[in-house]
Amino acid sequence: MDYIDWDKYIYMSSTSVYNPKHMNTVEADFNGYSNDFVWCNRFEFPYEEIKRQAEYALWQKYSDKKWIAVRYPFAIGKDDYTKRLLFYVEHVMKSEPMYIDNIDYQMSYIRSDEAGEFIAYLVDKDIEGAINGSSTGTISLREIINYVEENTGKHAILSDDGEVAPYNGEPEYSINTEKAEKKGYHFSNLKEWIY
């Protein structure tokens, strides 16, 4: 980035920069000046720290440039190669035990295609710095599991000895998108598409 020039740089960050996420998480909850950045590659630190380091670089080294750091929660959709949400559905369908440590926590998500649409929307908008993107509303894993059970007749097997679920360790949180809404973007309602 030291050798190129740009009108606006849009970086796809993550809500994992927030430590911790909580209900009504706002952009100011992560300060890009709170720590010194370290030049590193993506394998030197855990995912959330890599995202923080990338933002530290934008805030501290490139503060004289126009940039946006778009912070998303888990992006899910047909192209979700992580298959984290599918883990829960498949374990219910196959009656395989799973260990979930946050089954009743409300969490935020965004549709993967909407994540792309929002980045495209920002291209010609007068905005700089961090901005959150997330579907409106939250849902718990229990609500998702209950839906699968009700529509398939299958039952979840929850066990401390079950396979560790991919969203374990996530806190209860929601992502505030008022900044994006003030710029004219309105996110979809999570419960209108998640099922």
Regions found by a protein language model. Name each.
Residues 13, 54-79:
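Conserved beta-loop-beta element that borders a ligand/cofactor-binding pocket
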Residues 48, 69, 109, 138, ...:
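Short aromatic/basic micro-patch
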Residues 1, 20-23, 79-81, 142-143:
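Short glycine-/acidic-enriched loop or helix-start segments at secondary-structure transitions
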